[in-house]
Curated annotation (Swiss-Prot):
It comes from Candida albicans (strain SC5314 / ATCC MYA-2876) (Yeast). It is an enzyme of class 2 (transferase). This is tRNA (guanine(37)-N(1))-methyltransferase. GO terms for cellular component: cytoplasm; mitochondrial matrix; nucleus. GO terms for molecular function: tRNA (guanine(37)-N1)-methyltransferase activity; tRNA methyltransferase activity.
Length: 449
């Protein structure tokens, strides 16, 4: 065990910070003349104490000293060059006691010193964070020690004010879980920044996953200004709001009334009202009504979104010096009557909603005569879980998902034109994919019998 390891108490029930106190005996190189400090540090790196958060240069007896490696007991333990410098600079070796307390050790080190020995190999010190709230997923064997773990995480992360754990792993239809407060304030209303936008929501009542921020940005990067996007399971707006900031026209939907409430609030916070319409519908109903909802929006705005922006305008023709003033300008964006993209971020069940796209435009066959018409790209998230005794290749997993999609939309897609993106591994046997494909004309315009 290192001299710098924390003291051990595996019987601790409530966190006792005062227990974490340790004194480490060291030797310090005392400089009667501190002008030699810089030269010594440069020449004697291998004999200087370098330990996390410990300053190796200290004040001592109206001058300065440098802490030496913790295994140095006398001058003979030092490198020959260091011994020469000690004599050359008139350095005196003096004993020094380094005092360590609770603040010195990282959360993982503290937890390894207080949890049962059979649990220290995989200490749960990591977490995902939304605003001031840290969310950990404790395995069953760690749950009896949840309060201890939560308090240490709270102490060691200044931006965290609340630490929670899932009571169980069975989500309701809104993808939310009952939470247990482990430490800190019982305040679940958080403010989170992502993709240049601000989001406010009640973490206990809506779905939010900070680990998906890269995926949000990846999908948003596929949208162009003026595109129309249907966000089927939009939550509080992690896709919709950043997209609408780049003048993407978004119809955002979520079944959860709380998500819908905060989606509306986040639209106002981010001032993207002209480009986004929120809905509180079942996903199937939203897909079914999507063309009608878009047409209603188009007609209510005479096919145009107007956005007031402030622009610098030149007011002087002088070529050597130009003067500008800020003027309000009305920027216009045409509202198409068709969708460019649909986002389906509900990996547990999004695939099962794909059959609703059959006949999406079936009642409006003349739509494809629009010279600007494009078929929508579907971005559907899904899990493709496999057994522990399996070792499928990515290609095999892609094929499994491909077959499911073709069966659901009742059409043999060209697999070569589809994109299979692995978002993350939720567990060793549970990859999450996002599959992107163009909805075939034969499917989109299929007539209902």
């Amino acid at each position: 065990m290192s001299k710098f390891s924390p003291p051990i108490n595996r019987n601790m029930v409530e966190l006792d910070r005062s227990f974490f106190h340790k004194e480490v005996p060291l030797l310090a190189a005392y400089f009667p003349n501190p002008k030699f400090l810089g030269q010594f540090v440069k020449s004697c790196q291998n004999d200087i104490l370098y330990v996390q958060t410990v300053k190796h240069i200290i004040s001592m007896d109206d001058s300065k000293a440098i802490l030496l490696r913790d295994d140095v007991k006398s001058i003979s333990d030092l490198n020959p060059e260091t011994q020469l410098k000690i004599n050359e600079f008139g350095i005196i070796l003096k004993p020094y006691t380094l005092k360590l307390d609770y603040s010195f050790w990282k959360s993982e080190e503290i937890l390894k010193s207080i949890l049962p020995e059979n649990l220290i190999d995989d200490v749960p010190s990591g977490f995902s964070q939304a605003g001031h709230l840290a969310h950990i997923n404790l395995r069953d064997e760690y749950k009896p020690f949840g309060k201890l773990i939560g308090q240490v995480i709270l102490d060691k992360n200044p931006s965290v004010l609340t630490v929670v754990d899932k009571v169980n792993t069975i989500a309701n239809k809104f993808r939310t879980f009952p939470l247990e407060l482990l430490a800190g304030e019982p305040n679940y209303i958080v403010e989170q920044s992502e993709s240049g936008c601000k989001f406010k929501f009640d973490f206990s009542k809506v779905y939010w996953n900070s680990r998906l921020s890269t995926e949000h940005e990846r999908i948003i990067g596929k949208f162009n200004s003026g595109d129309v996007v249907g966000d089927v399971f939009g939550g509080v707006g992690p896709f919709a709001i950043p997209a609408s900031k780049k003048n993407v026209i978004v119809l955002a939907n979520d079944l959860n009334p709380e998500s819908y409430k905060y989606l509306q609030e986040n639209i106002k916070i981010n001032k993207v009202e002209p480009f986004i319409k929120p809905f509180n519908l079942d996903g199937r109903e939203f897909i079914r009504k999507a063309p009608e909802l878009l047409l209603q929006w188009h007609n209510s705005q005479n096919g145009i979104i107007e956005k007031k922006i402030i622009k610098k305008v030149s007011i002087d023709d002088n070529k050597t010096k130009k003067n500008f003033e800020r003027k309000p300008i009305i920027e216009t964006t045409k509202i198409p009557k068709f969708y460019h993209h649909f986002v389906m971020n509900l990996p547990d069940s999004a695939l099962t909603f794909l059959d609703e796209f059959i006949g999406l435009y079936g009642s409006n066959p003349q739509l494809k005569t629009d010279p600007e018409f494009k078929l929508p790209i579907i971005h559907v998230h899904c899990f493709e879980k496999f057994e522990n005794n399996e070792n499928p290749t990515p290609e095999e997993l892609h094929n499994r998902v491909y077959e499911k999609i073709c069966k659901l939309i009742q059409f043999p897609l060209n697999k070569e034109k589809m994109e299979f993106h692995e978002v993350r591994m939720v567990s060793p046997t549970k990859p999450m994919f996002c599959v992107s494909f163009e909805l075939p004309e034969e499917v989109a315009f299929k007539q209902s019998k």
